[in-house]
A protein has these predicted regions:
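N-terminal lobe of the biotin/lipoate ligase/transferase fold
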Residues: 1-104, 129
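Catalytic beta-strand/loop module used to bind and position nucleotide/cofactor moieties
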Residues: 48, 55-56, 69-75, 79-187
């Protein structure tokens, strides 16, 4: 972990300076997946802008239920809960909005990035971030939208089958990053 990478509810909350996104932060050392966790919170009435962050996910997943794994302390695993007041047909744009937020954050750290349609952020043609958006509706109205984000920050070694497809901030720069800072830039 980066020097002084204290990573908990308090440090994440202190790093975020927004009007509403991430004003309420839930942090866990381990969860099944941040999307599944915040979906449970949404059904219990969690408010718009609630952020769930985990150090480790035992059942992290991406699009098409692909398994997503990262060693503890290596990545950002978070999900933002939204309760938008527009038709479900427009919800897909939220994936792109989050992709743009991540891309801008990583650019602020000095990297050249691009967005690979529909849900990946890449550096040097390798994936650094994946986004999984899920929605709950009553058919006509959105009850909640969950935007899950996985960013490879201090991930030092990928499995051989992923080495030509994935990268991390530390692999691209040779330096470790404070995940609190990266979250604050994204939010």
């Amino acid at each position: 972990m980066a020097q002084n990478d204290r990573y908990n509810e308090e440090t994440i909350s202190q790093a975020i300076n927004t009007k509403w996104a991430g004003k309420t932060v839930h942090f866990a050392k381990e969860t099944d997946s941040t999307n599944s966790w915040i979906k449970r919170l949404a059904k219990e009435g969690a408010e718009h802008g609630t952020l769930a962050v985990a150090e480790f996910q035992s059942a992290g997943r991406g699009r098409f239920d692909r398994k997503w794994e990262a060693p503890e302390g290596s990545s950002i695993m978070m999900t933002l809960l939204l309760r938008p007041e527009f038709s479900p047909q427009y919800a897909s744009m939220l994936t792109l909005v989050m992709g743009l937020a991540v891309a801008q954050a990583v650019e602020e750290l000095g990297f050249e990035v691009s967005i690979k349609w529909p849900n990946d952020v890449v550096i040097s043609r390798k994936k650094i971030c994946g986004i999984l958006t899920e929605m709950g509706t009553n058919g006509v109205k959105i009850n909640y939208v969950l935007i899950g984000v996985g960013i490879n920050v201090n991930f030092k070694e990928f499995p051989e089958e992923m080495q030509d497809k994935a990268t991390s901030l530390i692999l691209e720069s040779g330096q470790e990053y404070d995940r609190n800072q990266v979250i604050s830039l994204v939010m």
